[in-house]
UniProtKB/Swiss-Prot annotation:
One GO cellular component, as annotated: chromosome, centromeric region
Homology family: Belongs to the class V-like SAM-binding methyltransferase superfamily. Histone-lysine methyltransferase family. Suvar3-9 subfamily.
Gene designation: Su(var)3-9
PANTHER family: HISTONE-LYSINE N-METHYLTRANSFERASE SUV39H (PTHR46223), HISTONE-LYSINE N-METHYLTRANSFERASE-RELATED (PTHR46223:SF4)
Gene Ontology molecular function: histone H3K9 trimethyltransferase activity; histone methyltransferase activity; zinc ion binding
Residues binding Zn(2+) 4, per UniProt: 561, 621, 623, 628
Organism: Drosophila pseudoobscura pseudoobscura
Binding-site residues, Zn(2+) 3: 419, 454, 460, 464
Residues where Zn(2+) 1 binds: 409, 411, 419, 425-426
Top EC class for this record: transferase
Full protein name: Histone-lysine N-methyltransferase Su(var)3-9
Major place of residence: nucleus
E.C. numbers: 2.1.1.355
Assembly with partners or alone: Interacts with Su(var)205 and Su(var)3-7. Probably associates with HDAC1/Rpd3.
Record flagged with keyword Methyltransferase: yes
Length: 633
């Protein structure tokens, strides 16, 4: 078999080439090196031919067969096919495109150099200017990184994360200064996609806020101080500008969901083991104990991605057979806690749905009064499903039905004006004074006084000053769960002045005999909703309002030894002294957000006992007032 040296001696036209000095990018099909139809091959290790420029020469040249001996004097033959005209054109085209790409890269480098020079000449703005504040709102995407961030490599994740840039990741870890500089550049250099542009109609597209960048891909996740950090590739930036970002900077990013889903599938075997172990531990913790270590705010802020990321981190430790114990233990405890939060989160969602349904039913009944909002930011309780919200009293068995008005005032006919304190209005006709201030419409009576409003027999219309209770509630309220153990309460979302009508005490009107029987059961539960209609203290009350199962917003108003509401008896259509309306008015100015309360023990007449209460048990007062009596009844 002839050698390559023999062929050179036979063919005098062949030229000996030194491929180490050959500039491949300048070769064309007409180059002398190609026309010579010669290829000199650098020999590497046994059975291998060194790659590089020589390979390009062989591909462009038309050498059909090359024979040579390797270092062990073994003959090696390489056969090459002649390139077609089509392939030659494609090679020339690719060379032109490469040249065009090099020009674009040089232009981009010049632009970046000019920007760096311009930034060096101008002072840096504070961090609050470069990026939006975290307290106000969590931005969708931010490039702000953790300070001095360098992921832990104790678990050996580099081989199992599926990161395309593992070498770059390791370089960034070994050179924290370079990493910090990269992040600084990433924050300060605006992304090309952030530039202002114009639509076809000429309108300007709003520019993205400074400090926000688009995530192209999340490459991997590591652990820094027991918290996950993510290696992020930014859109419009080279991989050298990748940064490590905390979860808070990426929580609203769509790429985060893709990353988590991808890694859940990758580690599904280990995650199944981990979740099984944690479920066993969770089953040993009663759900009633959850709220002792978990707040409602934490439940509302529950993010399922955070729990899934903990599963991924634990799975990576197992997949890498890491010897580290401290980090997996801490992350495992955090995952168990988040599983508790998840369990309470499901109960919280059901609770919010139930409260919303009750709120809708209540406000439909209350129309056209202002809406009442329902909220519970303390525990997972809901409104008792046995409670029925009503707008008017239910007349029980043995209670006479009130009749329509038999007499009314003639103020409008006599003076031609509305009812006033000086006119012979309903109040004066009943032996009381006019109840409301004509200018403000607020109550001007002292607690314990009776209110007589105009009725259907009066000559005045609905705009009369003496028609307040019958026109309904005019102020919005909030039904909320208290934090002092008093159950549900009512507060006002806006300030209320003294003498403002709040609501009427609504429920079932029953006889006192029936009330005594019900009162025994209510006392055992430490709650009572019985309200005696005993304005006429000269004799025992005949009837009682029971708001335990049927009632309105007044059902939830709590007791206070220093109340801001008082109960007034009010007559409108009928004058049966045994069946007054029980109405609440403010007795002092009330601030927005303050809880509404009244004295259950009739502070206006301490000598009158609460007849329907047994003495078998004492209920502790939780009002917290300075003059608190400590015992409710």
């Amino acid at each position: 078999m002839a050698t390559a040296e023999a062929q050179v001696n036979v063919n005098r036209n062949l030229q000996k080439q030194d491929l180490r000095n050959l500039e491949v990018s300048n070769l064309t099909p007409l180059s002398p090196e190609v026309i010579s139809r010669q290829a000199t091959i650098n020999i590497g290790t046994i059975g291998h031919v060194a790659h590089g420029k020589s390979t390009v020469v062989k591909a462009i040249s038309g050498v059909q067969t090359v024979r040579f001996k390797n270092e062990l004097e073994r003959n090696i033959t390489i056969k090459l096919e002649r390139l077609s005209e089509k392939k030659i054109k494609l090679l020339l085209k690719s060379k032109h495109q490469r040249h065009k790409y090099d020009i674009q890269q040089q232009k981009l480098l010049r632009i970046l150099a000019e920007r760096r020079k311009a930034r060096a000449m101008t002072p840096l703005a504070p961090a609050s200017v470069l990026a939006p504040s975290m307290e106000t709102a969590r931005p969708r995407l931010r490039s702000t990184s953790l300070n001095s961030l360098s992921p832990s490599n104790s678990s050996g994740y580099g081989s199992i994360l599926g990161c395309d840039d593992s070498d770059q990741s390791s370089q960034l870890v070994l050179k924290p200064n370079v990493l910090k500089r990269r992040r600084s550049n990433c924050v300060q250099i605006p992304t090309p996609a952030a530039k202002r542009s114009r639509k076809n109609d000429g309108t300007t597209v709003k520019r993205r806020p400074k400090g926000e960048y688009i995530v192209e891909k999340i490459e991997s996740v590591e652990v820094v101080q027991f918290q996950p950090v993510f290696f992020v590739k930014w859109l419009g930036y080279d991989v050298s500008a990748n940064t490590w970002e905390s979860y808070v900077n990426l929580s609203d990013c769509a790429e985060m969901e893709k990353f988590v889903e991808r890694h859940l599938q990758l580690h599904q075997h280990y995650i199944a083991q981990i979740t099984g172990e944690l479920d066993t531990q969770l089953s040993d913790i009663p759900q009633t104990e959850d709220l002792k270590t978990i707040s409602i705010a934490e439940i509302d802020a529950y993010d399922p991605l955070e729990l899934q990321i903990d599963f991924i981190l634990l799975a990576q430790y197992r997949a890498a057979a890491s010897r580290s114990q401290r980090e997996p233990e801490r992350i495992g405890a955090r995952a168990l806690h988040r599983m508790q939060v998840r369990r309470s989160h499901f109960a919280r969602r059901k609770q919010l749905i139930d409260l919303l349904l009750f709120e809708h039913r209540m406000n439909r009944v209350e129309l056209p009064s202002p809406p009442i909002r329902v909220e519970n930011n303390w525990d997972l309780d809901t409104i008792d499903s046995g409670f029925k919200y009503i707008q008017k009293n239910i007349i029980g068995e043995g209670v006479p039905k009130p009749q329509a008005g038999l007499v009314g005032c003639m103020c409008r006919h006599q003076s031609g004006e509305q009812c006033t304190a000086s006119s012979m209005c309903c109040g004066r006709m009943a032996g009381e004074i006019f109840a409301y201030d004509r200018t403000t419409g607020r109550l001007r009576l002292r607690p314990g006084s009776a209110i007589y409003e105009c009725n259907s027999r009066c000559s005045c219309d609905e705009s009369c000053t003496n028609r307040v209770v019958q026109n309904g509630r005019k102020h919005p309220l909030v039904l909320f769960k208290t934090s002092n153990g008093s159950g549900w309460g009512v507060r006002t979302p806006q300030p209320l002045k003294k003498g403002v009508f709040v609501c009427e005490y609504i429920g079932e009107i029953i006889t006192c005999e029936e009330a005594n029987e019900r009162g025994k059961a209510y006392d055992d539960n430490g709650r009572t909703y019985l309200f005696d209609l005993d304005y006429n203290t000269s004799r025992d009350s005949e009837y009682t309002v029971d708001a335990a199962n049927f009632g309105n917003i007044s059902h939830f108003i709590n007791h206070s030894c220093d109340p801001n509401l008082a109960v007034f008896p009010c007559w409108i259509e009928h004058l049966n002294t045994a069946l007054p309306h029980l109405v609440f008015f403010t007795i002092r100015p009330i601030k927005a957000g303050e809880e509404l309360s009244f004295d259950y023990i009739r502070a206006d007449n301490e000598e009158v006992p609460y007849e329907n209460l047994s003495t078998a048990a004492r209920v502790q007062c939780r009002c917290g007032a300075a003059n608190c009596r400590k015992v409710l009844f």
